[in-house]
A protein has these predicted regions:
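Short, glycine/proline-biased beta-turn/loop segments that scaffold the active-site neighborhood
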Residues: 12-28, 113-114
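Glycine-centered, phosphate/nucleic-acid-interacting loop/turn motifs that mediate DNA/RNA or nucleotide
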Residues: 9
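Short, surface-exposed loop or secondary-structure junction motifs
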Residues: 28-196
Length: 196
């Protein structure tokens, strides 16, 4: 989705993330080093998930007094660490640039044109088509059904703030899609955005 915006020249991979999200995103150990969109997408931003990643507040100095813990000791673009918050930030940037909610943009601009069934909003999907998830319970030594994994997000969506509430859809990996349709998506991805 971000690369569609890059191709349309609506955004640059070298842009300062701070300008795109609306608050300062800087590793306090390297305050003069700009963190770019490219660094987010390649997990080289020096950001970590230690303060959480279900809210952008984790990294926002105005919202979290411990925001500095969200950064690693290495300079941005000098190391690699997988970080979910990177992609939640990217999803928020997508919303700010397009004015379209993350899940709806993915649906309209990627899934629907490819004829794929899936999405990031569990409220819009047929629950009968979603596999049930089980978690291992150590106390009972059994696997127990975990209904919260795909719980509706009705309240969160009703209170949604564009460019800020994006993590509820989990741009980090919250896509619900069949293996067949995911394979179709990956073919398109491997062919630089073209399918068939």
């Amino acid at each position: 989705a971000i690369m569609q915006l890059v191709a349309k020249k609506q955004i640059s991979l070298d842009q300062d993330v701070s300008e795109l999200v609306g608050f300062k995103v800087r590793n306090p150990k390297f305050p003069s080093t700009v963190i770019t969109l490219k660094m987010l997408l390649s997990h080289r931003s020096s950001i970590n998930d230690s303060e959480g990643y279900f809210s952008l507040d984790a990294i926002d100095p105005a919202k979290n007094p411990n925001w500095e813990k969200s950064y690693n000791a290495y300079e941005p673009n000098k190391g690699y660490m997988y970080c979910n918050l990177n992609y939640n930030l990217a999803g928020s940037i997508l919303e700010k640039i397009t004015g379209v909610r993350f899940d709806q943009y993915i649906q309209q601009q990627i899934l629907d044109p490819l004829g794929l069934y899936g999405g990031y909003n569990v409220n819009a999907l047929d629950s009968n088509l979603i596999a049930k998830i089980y978690e291992y319970n150590r106390d009972s030594a059994k696997f127990i059904y975990s209904p919260n994994a795909y719980a509706p997000r009705t309240e969160e969506i009703n209170n949604y703030t564009m460019g800020r509430s994006t993590p509820i859809f989990s741009p980090t990996g919250g896509m619900k899609i069949s293996a067949h349709d995911l394979a179709t998506y990956m073919v398109m991805h491997s062919q630089l955005g073209k399918y068939k």
